[in-house]
Amino acid sequence: MEKFTDLNYTLSVITLMNSTLHTILEDPGMAYFPYIAYVLTVLFTLHKASIPTMKIALKTSKCSYKVVKYCIVTIFNTLLKLAGYKEQITTKDEIEKQMDRVVKEMRRQLEMIDRLTTREIEQVELLKRIHDKLVMQSTGEIDMTKEINQKNMKTLEEWESGRNPYEPKEVTAAM
């Protein structure tokens, strides 16, 4: 029976609010009512959501100052978003985190540029060596002894013992 009474009470409160809203909205002087209701709803929601959150955070956190600061910054950022601003309030910790992230990214970019520069220098040196090998140098007379394989040929007089080492020798076998 108690639950039924609570349900009737809730329904009567909703009916009362609806009738009140209809009478207010019929009045032409209340053109800004939806905006006022919107702001009040947001403030009420923030109030109801932030107080228990702050209590839990303060009990469980070791550093209550940072928690309070973070909650206040979050509330103000929410209000700024609701007002249509794109800017946000940031704490020093967030700024330091963002700066560290930017510095890390810059270091990574510099390392990549250094690696690419080193590779490009190596490629240029390799291309220079290839070019130097491909460049034809003009010579007055071409030595053809290399081409016909006669550079190291010796005549009979030039051999040390005076006989041709490539000539077959007589071999006798014992029977």
UniProtKB/Swiss-Prot annotation:
Glycans are attached at N8, N18. The N-glycosyl content is primarily Man(9)GlcNAc, with a small amount of Man(8)GlcNAc. One of its GO terms (cellular component) is membrane. Residues 1-28 are lumenal. Signal peptide: none annotated. SUPFAM superfamilies: Rotavirus nonstructural proteins (SSF58030). It is a single-pass type III membrane protein. One of its GO terms (molecular function) is toxin activity. It comes from the Viruses. Its main location: host cell. It is found in: Host rough endoplasmic reticulum membrane; Host membrane, Host caveola; Secreted. Ca(2+) binds at E120, Q123. Pfam families: Rota_NSP4. The chain crosses the membrane at residues 29-51. GO terms for biological process: monoatomic ion transmembrane transport; symbiont-mediated activation of host autophagy; viral process. The keyword NAD does not apply. Belongs to the rotavirus NSP4 family. Homotetramer. Interacts with the immature particle in the viroplasm. Interacts with host CAV1, early and late in infection. Interacts with host integrin ITGA1/ITGB1 heterodimer. Interacts with host integrin ITGA2/ITGB1 heterodimer. Interaction with microtubules blocks trafficking to the Golgi apparatus. Plays an essential role in the virus replication cycle by acting as a viroporin. Creates a pore in the host endoplasmic reticulum and as a consequence releases Ca(2+) in the cytoplasm of infected cell. In turn, high levels of cytoplasmic calcium trigger membrane trafficking and transport of viral ER-associated proteins to viroplasms, sites of viral genome replication and immature particle assembly. The secreted form acts as an enterotoxin that causes phospholipase C-dependent elevation of the intracellular calcium concentration in host intestinal mucosa cells. Increased concentration of intracellular calcium disrupts the cytoskeleton and the tight junctions, raising the paracellular permeability. Potentiates chloride ion secretion through a calcium ion-dependent signaling pathway, inducing age-dependent diarrhea. Binds 1 calcium ion per tetramer. This is Non-structural glycoprotein 4. It comes from Rotavirus A (isolate RVA/Cow/India/Hg18/2000/G15P[21]) (RV-A).
